[in-house]
Amino acid sequence: MDLYCWNTEISAAFYVVLQFCELSIRNGAVEAVEAVFGPNWHLNRGFVYTLPVLRGNRGYQPRNDLQSCAARLPTAGKVVAELKFAFWQSLFVKGQQARIWDTHLARAFPGYDRALTLAQARTQMFDNIEKIRKLRNRVALNRPGFIGDL
């Protein structure tokens, strides 16, 4: 029981910080996408078709998620709020480097490590978002935090 209580306390401590991380990443990504595809980026077919589609319909499908949200929600703001965190991570794949990040990474994420190339910074962002996403899911699902590194 002590470990369960400790895990609950650790999860609560991480929750607010993880929410701020998610919002910061999401808002930076939205800023960059809007700069390239305009304020109605969620309806822009040119943008939609740049999103990855996993073969065999296995795993998270960012294109399908965006199309589903855009079809039922009236504004970009509502779409932004509804998209999964994995959607924002999917924008940091190599295929979006020249399209979005070469020209907008520094403005959207001014604190990035400038010792890195833009491609390295984008890759680092993807990897760090993956760590944040996994920790967030552990916290949200109340999985034991005392197993493995926090």
Task: Describe the role of every protein-language-model region.
Residues 1-150:
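Amphipathic alpha-helical interface elements
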